[in-house]
């Protein structure tokens, strides 16, 4: 991620997109001990920051369901998994909370909007998972 801005510039990507890519890791300390310090400023950047960790938690919860799907999931299921710090322990609850705060949203609103977005692209997610299994 420290190399991302350089690589993106070399690829002709605009500074606004580069800022968005880099800011989604704001405050996270990476393997080399560097803490990323580009704060999300625009709403899209804040949504990306908030949803990145949360989608991991939601997907982990979906994989534990008999359906292996988010289609039959409710916000109450996400809340329950969010409270269990052992579940999807690699998904930072603090980052999710900070993301909701940055957006001015309650956690329930972030959970609901993220779940609905994931439900809207369930077919594509499932197809990507199948392709990954084949490779």
Task: Please report, for each region that a protein language model flagged, where it lies by residue.
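Alpha-helical scaffold segments in soluble metabolic enzymes
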Residues: 7, 59-62, 77, 95, ...
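Charged phosphate-binding loop/patch that engages nucleotide di/tri-phosphates or the phosphate backbone
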Residues: 98-135
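Short amphipathic alpha-helical interaction segments
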Residues: 70, 74, 88, 102-106, ...
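Divalent metal-dependent catalytic cores for phosphoryl transfer on phosphate-bearing substrates
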Residues: 1-87
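Charged/polar, low-hydrophobicity segments characteristic of intrinsically disordered regions
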Residues: 82-103
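Short loop/turn and capping residues at structural boundaries
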Residues: 18-21, 93, 111
């Amino acid at each position: 991620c420290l190399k991302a801005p350089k690589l993106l510039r070399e690829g002709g990507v605009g500074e606004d997109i580069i800022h968005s890519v880099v800011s989604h890791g704001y405050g996270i300390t990476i393997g080399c001990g560097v803490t990323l310090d580009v704060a999300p400023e625009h709403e899209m950047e804040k949504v990306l920051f908030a949803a990145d960790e949360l989608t991991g938690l939601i997907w982990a919860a979906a994989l534990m369901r008999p359906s292996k799907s988010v289609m039959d999931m409710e916000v109450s299921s996400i809340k329950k998994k969010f409270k269990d710090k052992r579940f999807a322990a690699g998904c930072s609850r603090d980052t999710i909370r900070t993301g909701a705060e940055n957006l001015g949203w309650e956690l329930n609103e972030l959970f609901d909007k993220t779940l609905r977005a994931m439900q809207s692209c369930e077919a594509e997610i499932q197809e990507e998972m199948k392709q990954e299994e084949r490779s």
